[in-house]
């Protein structure tokens, strides 16, 4: 059920099919492999595994630099207390060759990109977005907007991820060492993404920037389903709800394709005007608003009527 929920019950499905050229499904796959090898590495550490993980981390970060946060997931895996964290740091200091190999492999992936940037611009580091004012506002994170707003809230347009988020609370009951790496990664990921000037990430179905981390979010989703299995009431209601949310996600995809969900962002009136409707109504076009990009580049977020 977890595989179905993540695979066809989220906006990952849309970006694997209708807009497969976007990088999110690729990064989802890379992070899935990275998570798998994190588990394998700590069961049986080796130079080969850490080198491959360095290559993976380099490619993941090259595709989307903010995904460097997956290294925190790797560092904190199976850490459940301050003493276990100290032990992890001490272990890596003693096994410094592992970190060195990972760092070299990480940088190797970036060398072709550095070379290309230097060739075309004369600079090793080059900002390729080319958008005036493209920056982070770390003192003005749009956490409420990015999570629960009608505009493009992650939990509004991908509600299965809200179930997964709640599932983080059940992780300590499943296994020690799961809670800290996932909670810290998710909180920092939300903070960083919500601090980007264009926190809604342009025209898209749902919050596409979160797709990359769905392999990590699958863990608490599985945990809450496992926890629910021991409860007479939740044993049936939670899986049923997830199946309904899978259907709802696919209905919303059709809404998005038919413009009943706007690609820029929505508002409360527009959302409820087309709720459970496959196509937009005449009133929908009257109440829809879009973001003011010029003001957003200054960290000011207001609606404006489309011309």
Question: Each PLM stretch: what is its role?
Answer:
Residues 1-307:
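Membrane-proximal envelope and lipid/glycan-remodeling enzymes
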């Amino acid at each position: 059920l977890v595989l179905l929920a993540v695979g066809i019950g989220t906006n990952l499905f849309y970006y694997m099919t209708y807009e497969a050229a976007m990088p999110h499904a690729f990064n989802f796959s890379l992070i899935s492999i990275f998570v798998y090898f994190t588990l394998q590495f700590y069961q049986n550490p080796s130079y080969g595994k850490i080198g491959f993980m360095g290559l993976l981390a380099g490619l993941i970060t090259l595709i989307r630099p903010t995904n460097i946060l997956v290294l925190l997931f790797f560092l904190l895996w199976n850490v459940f207390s301050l003493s276990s964290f100290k032990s992890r740091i001490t272990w890596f200091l003693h096994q410094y060759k592992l970190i060195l190999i990972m760092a070299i492999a990480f940088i190797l992936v970036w060398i072709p990109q550095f070379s290309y940037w230097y060739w075309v611009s004369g600079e090793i580091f080059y900002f390729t977005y080319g958008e005036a004012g493209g920056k982070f506002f770390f003192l003005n994170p749009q956490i409420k907007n990015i999570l629960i707003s009608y505009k493009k809230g992650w939990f509004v347009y991908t509600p299965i991820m809200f179930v997964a988020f709640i599932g983080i609370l059940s992780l300590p009951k499943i296994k020690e060492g799961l809670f800290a790496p996932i909670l810290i990664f998710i909180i920092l990921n939300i903070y960083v993404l919500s601090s980007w000037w264009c926190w809604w990430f342009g025209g898209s179905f749902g919050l596409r920037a979160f797709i990359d981390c769905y392999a990590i979010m699958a863990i608490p989703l599985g945990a809450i389903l496992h926890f629910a299995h021991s409860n007479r009431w939740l044993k049936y209601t939670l899986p049923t709800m997830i199946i309904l949310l899978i259907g709802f996600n696919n209905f919303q995809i059709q809404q998005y394709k038919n413009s009943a969900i706007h690609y820029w962002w929505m508002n409360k009136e527009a959302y409820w005007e087309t709720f459970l409707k496959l196509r937009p109504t005449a009133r929908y076009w009257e109440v829809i608003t879009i973001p003011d990009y010029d003001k957003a580049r200054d960290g000011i977020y207001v609606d404006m009527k489309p011309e």
